[in-house]
């Protein structure tokens, strides 16, 4: 069980109907797109406080979860701020590179500010939904939304194999660590290469075991969701 999945089961709203959670998330997303940057910042603070209270976690831990997508968002915002132009008077600040100027424009700063707060608020709302929606409730929500059965089964299998992959990786790395496989940088690279090779082999073996189990149970191509 991953950290996010474990948190979703300890949420104060773990047993609240998934439809209500989805509707609340939808309202959060609509507000994230229609509010001005100041309103988006206020919504972000409300979502952060609600997430910490529901999940019984500290604000620091929530910020660490948000730091993962924040890095990608920051790179995107930086690319919006900077522009290339032949007319330096259009730039607030810039440097010349041959016949071109690279710098910051007023429109770029405004767009970057709006994009930053809108995206960060939408990300926090989506993270709230993920951390408060256990996987069985997600499957139930997909069924109620009449998502094609094949797609739902694919999501279920992908989720299962994700856990298999993580379990095998943790077991192999623990065994390598006990044998001082990561005591130095060269040994670490060597152990990492061995982990990748063993992981591929063991996941294939687990897949074959699951296929055999399904055949024994007279699997006809449909999972009972």
UniProtKB/Swiss-Prot annotation:
Identification of the protein by name: Cobalt transport protein CbiQ
Membrane topology: Multi-pass membrane protein
Signal peptide stretch: none
Protein's pathway: Cofactor biosynthesis; adenosylcobalamin biosynthesis
Main location as per UniProt: membrane
GO terms under biological process: cobalamin biosynthetic process; cobalt ion transport
Known role: Part of the energy-coupling factor (ECF) transporter complex CbiMNOQ involved in cobalt import. The complex confers cobalt uptake upon expression in E.coli; can also transport nickel with a very low affinity.
């Amino acid at each position: 069980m991953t950290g996010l999945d474990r948190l979703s089961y300890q949420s104060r709203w773990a047993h609240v109907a998934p439809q209500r959670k989805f509707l609340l998330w939808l309202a959060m997303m609509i507000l994230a797109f229609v509010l001005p940057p100041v309103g988006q910042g206020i919504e972000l603070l409300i979502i952060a406080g609600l997430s910490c209270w529901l999940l019984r976690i500290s604000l620091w831990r929530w910020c660490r979860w948000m730091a993962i997508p924040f890095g990608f968002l920051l790179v995107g915002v930086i690319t919006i701020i900077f522009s290339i132009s032949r007319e330096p008077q259009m730039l607030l600040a810039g440097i010349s590179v041959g016949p071109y100027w690279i710098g910051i424009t007023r429109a770029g700063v405004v767009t970057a500010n709006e994009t930053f707060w809108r995206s960060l608020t939408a990300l926090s709302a989506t993270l709230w939904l993920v951390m408060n929606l256990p996987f069985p409730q997600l499957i139930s929500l997909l069924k109620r939304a009449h998502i094609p059965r094949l797609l739902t089964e694919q999501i279920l299998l992908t989720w299962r194999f994700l856990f298999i992959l993580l379990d095998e990786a943790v077991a192999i790395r623990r065994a390598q660590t006990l044998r001082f496989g990561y005591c130095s940088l060269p040994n670490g690279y060597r152990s990492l290469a061995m982990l990748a090779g063993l992981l591929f082999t063991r996941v294939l073996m687990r897949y074959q075991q699951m296929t055999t189990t399904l055949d024994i149970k007279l699997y006809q191509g449909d999972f009972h969701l």
